[in-house]
Amino acid sequence: MIQVLLVIICLAVFPYQGSSIILESGNVNDFELVYPKKVTVLPTGAMNSAHPCCDPVTCKPKRGEHCISGPCCRNCKFLSPGTICKKAKGDDMNDYCTGISSDCPRNPWKD
């Protein structure tokens, strides 16, 4: 009961003002204390993000997902190692995904 009351008081005293509030708790003398901790300001529209890979609060990949975007990212997962991410042009060589990043690294065998 005290926790609920303290949360209500904290939210009333520290209303949402464009930044995210995390409620932390600690046990002091067997009384549960709850206090707000201000965290990073969210970009405009982050809470309404419709990107299927993006956690709208953290703007990072959702739990269980690898990536949000990039040439080696598809459906929130890294593409398999050896997948062509940049086709060769002229005398150039193809670039391939590593399977551990959404970036497309330059082929190390290029001159």
Swiss-Prot record:
Annotated SUPFAM superfamilies: Blood coagulation inhibitor (disintegrin) (SSF57552)
Keyword Cell membrane: no
Signal peptide positions (record): 1-20
Disintegrin domain ranges (all copies): 47-111
An annotated GO cellular component: extracellular region
UniProt motif Cell attachment site: location: 89-91
Matches recorded under Gene3D superfamilies: Disintegrin domain (4.10.70.10)
Pfam families in alphabetical order: Disintegrin
Statement: the UniProt record of this protein carries the keyword Signal: yes
Molecular function via GO: toxin activity
Tissue and organ distribution: Expressed by the venom gland.
Disulphide-bonded residues: C53-C76, C67-C73, C72-C97, C85-C104
Compartment(s) where it occurs, according to its Swiss-Prot or TrEMBL record: Secreted
Propeptide residues, chain positions: 21-46
Keywords: Cell adhesion impairing toxin, Disulfide bond, Hemostasis impairing toxin, Platelet aggregation inhibiting toxin, Secreted, Signal, Toxin
Function description: Inhibits ADP-induced human platelet aggregation. Antagonist of alpha-IIb/beta-3 (ITGA2B/ITGB3).
Similarity-based family: Belongs to the disintegrin family. Dimeric disintegrin subfamily.
Quaternary context: Heterodimer with subunit beta; disulfide-linked.
Protein name: Disintegrin CV-11-alpha
